[in-house]
Swiss-Prot record:
Protein name, UniProt field: UPF0299 membrane protein YohJ
Domain of life assignment: Bacteria
Protein's membrane topology: Multi-pass membrane protein
Record gene name: yohJ
HAMAP family: UPF0299
GO cellular component: plasma membrane
Keywords, in A-Z order: Cell inner membrane, Cell membrane, Membrane, Transmembrane, Transmembrane helix
Topology feature Cytoplasmic, residues: 28-30, 84-92
Family: Belongs to the UPF0299 family.
Length: 132
């Protein structure tokens, strides 16, 4: 019985912490003058708490495993909601594809540029002919 209560406590604690960060993000988003989704702010709060080791990762792991395991199921309502606008999407298929392609290219270029900026040019160990 004690082991069962311990497992229930771990899952309950994980979900309470994840939802606390989510609702803190929603609250902060309601105070901001710009529109930023509260879920994004909540994820950033959770990330900062984990990165600064204020919140031990083992406290949120059980809840994260459950959410990741059933993530595909959580996208079903979104897919059904998008299908309500199928005619609009079909009419605007060209611009949607072009904007997706352009935004993918822009993201690729920005990530490659920022990676080059952060990491710089590095000498490959064992590379011949690069000793100057």
């Amino acid at each position: 019985m004690s082991k069962t209560l311990n497992i229930i406590w771990q899952y309950l604690r994980a979900f309470v912490l994840i939802y606390a960060c989510l609702y803190a993000g929603i609250f902060i988003a309601s105070l901001l003058p710009v529109t930023i989704p509260g879920s994004i702010i909540g994820m950033l709060i959770l990330f900062v708490l984990l990165a600064l080791q204020i919140l031990p990762a083992k406290w949120v792991n059980p809840g994260c495993y459950v959410l990741i395991r059933y993530m595909a199921l959580l996208f079903v309502p979104i897919g059904v909601g998008v299908m309500q606008y199928f005619d609009l999407l079909r009419a605007q298929f060209g611009p949607v594809v072009v904007s997706c392609a352009i935004s993918t290219l822009v993201v690729f270029l920005v990530v490659s540029w920022s990676s080059q900026l952060v990491h710089g040019e590095r000498k490959v160990v064992g590379q011949k002919g690069s000793e100057e």
